[in-house]
Amino acid sequence: MGIGRFAFTPILPLMIQEGTVHLAQTAWLSSSNYIGYLVGALSLLKNNRHPLFVVLGLTLVTLTTWLASLSSFDWLLVLRFLAGVASAWVLVSISAFAINWLKSRQVATSGLIYTGVGIGITLTGLICSYFIFQSATVNVAAQSLSSPLSSRLWQYLGVIALLATLVVTFLLAKINSQFASTAAATTAAAKAHPSKAAHTKASHTNPTASITPAKLKLANVLTAYGLFGFGYILPATFLPQIAKQWLSGQSYLLIWPFFGLAAALSVVLSQDLQRRFDNVSLLGVWRVSQIIMAVGTLLPALWQSLAGLMLSALMVGGTFMVVTMAGLQVAASQVTHYPKYNLSALMTASFAFGQLIGPLTALVATGKNIWLALLPVSAIVLLIGVALLWRPYQHQQSSNHV
């Protein structure tokens, strides 16, 4: 997913430089991807076939990544849409499947699955940065004899995605077989002791009177998660392009690998907090992380230097997967009255709607320094989301930890 969802970001400055796409078209390509992400999430609202959609999503990621090397702008719109659908299938399905499977094995570090996205971002960033840097030392005549570098990068990443998909498919089939055996044993035990099973079910069923408060909580959580999608998406999509505009030489190539590394390590750090401090709540982690993200989003508008952009990459990259993880787990722990919906899909759909609006704001602004106006707006939206999280829960303490 780190490839299919985010490879576009480090390749984008190169595609603009080569003339494959123009700056004005990038918002359309981004929006196409985010529409696909929304459609993919909505398509899974009532789906429970998680392993199937993980494999389908990864397969589609592989195809769309490789085919991007051959495509014109019109076809890129279609491919970015399909890549968005595939990414939503992967995130929703692996979140629902893997967390449940790990919990069934009493593994306390289920959130570590989210390091995968950061690792994928880091990998794509390093590969793209290496080849872009190397191409700067090749003479123009030699470059003219080969295909555009952006096309070759899409092909390289497509091959990596294919290899990873084959490995994941094999491992997922093995894990799913073990999970099915465990579920069958649990069902057999429940049939053997029906009174105990009925008592357990009743003890976890809330009274009808509590349904209305739960709906209010769901509305606040969904809205806050959607605002997170809007707020984070501009730096997460355009930070390397911003860096290329404002920095000299090849130093902008450092930004995206650093962003991905921060994303991967931040999830590990949040898991470590659980082991060290029992009073660290999921909701608290969400709030604090989103405040840090807001500051990191605003930073490039105030500090246009390598240090400022690196710090922004650290603050946004180091929080967005933590917020993703915490948001999905807060929703699952706070809302228990919607069994007919896949809650991960519902949350992801809200997020997708928010991130869809983000790039569209870039369409109404023009010029090299449009980010000076747009990034503060994103930061304000993130803080509004934090305010929504504070009010409904200010008298409530969560017992769930990251």
Residue map of PLM features:
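Paired small-residue
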Residues: 74-83, 307-315
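Extracytoplasmic gate region of multi-pass secondary transporters
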Residues: 9, 217-257
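Helix-loop-helix hairpin linking two adjacent transmembrane segments in secondary transporters
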Residues: 73, 109-176
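Helix-to-loop junctions at the C-terminal end of transmembrane segments
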Residues: 39-51, 266-281, 366
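A late C-terminal transmembrane helix in Major Facilitator Superfamily
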Residues: 335-369
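Cytoplasmic helix-loop-helix junction between adjacent transmembrane helices
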Residues: 81-116
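C-terminal transmembrane helical hairpin of 12-TM major facilitator-type secondary transporters
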Residues: 281-327
